[in-house]
Amino acid sequence: MSNTDYAALNKRFAIPGQLDFAPGPGGLAVAEVNNAHASAMIALQGAHVMTWAPRKQPPVIWLSKAAKFAPGKSIRGGVPICWPWFGPHATEAKFPGHGFARTVMWEVVKTETLRDGATRLTFRIVQDDATRAQWPHASEAYNIVTSGRALDIELATRNTGSAAITIGDAFHTYFEVADIRRCTIHGLGNCPYLDKVDGGKKKQQTGPVTIDGEVDRIYLDSTADVLIDDPGLNRRIRVSKRG
């Protein structure tokens, strides 16, 4: 983006002492959040939360040191958005896995400071002929990011047409831990899951999840909070979900 673009973004959406817009890694446009509770960096490409750290604490969101930052390329780490489908496309093998939302630009439509001092940004996906060729449905996607005592991310789709549509979406979040082999994950006990390392077989979780090798699973019908117990960083990360 040009300096004029940043000037316009900051004039309309910056919050003094909390939020501004600037070139980030690889020249990607980013929103930089620094408030009394936490710091965060969000790329406008993909409305992608790249980093989030509570004040005076290690990062909670992991960003790979080998991440590539380039227009149209997915960023390894952070919180990539999967939209409007999850996994491979149902009929078109040439379409990107997990959709295109994480590699296209999103526009800022609103910023605000909440009563507790948290910072909230609302992004809307920018669609063009290329995205409409893959997703020819009248719809809008919004990503609402709130950085405060907790990180809250809300993905919403609005059907702007008259026909019903079916979407798949997810946050493909990467969490920062000291040593994954020492971590335990609570809250998924008795949940069925698909084990993609074992050919997609359906299995059931017994007790906490531990990781000592390759793990690739899709847990089904999980509504409880999930706790990542990390003794190396002496903390627990709570993952809550709604919707």
Whereabouts are the PLM-identified features?
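Extended, compositionally biased flexible segments
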Residues: 60-114, 123-124
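Beta-strand elements of well-folded, non-transmembrane domains
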Residues: 127-129, 145-149, 159-161, 173-177
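Hydrophobic residues positioned within well-ordered beta-strands of beta-sheet architectures
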Residues: 31, 40, 121-123, 141-143, ...
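Extended, loop-rich substrate-binding clefts of extracytoplasmic carbohydrate-active enzymes
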Residues: 25, 95-147
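Active-site/ligand-binding surface loops and adjacent short beta/alpha elements
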Residues: 164-166, 170-243
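Beta-strand-rich N-terminal accessory domains
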Residues: 1-76, 224-225, 230-243
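Residues that act as N-cap/strand-start positions at coil-to-secondary-structure junctions
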Residues: 25-27, 36, 100-105, 137-139, ...
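Asparagine-centered strand-capping/turn motif at beta-strand->loop junctions
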Residues: 42, 155-161
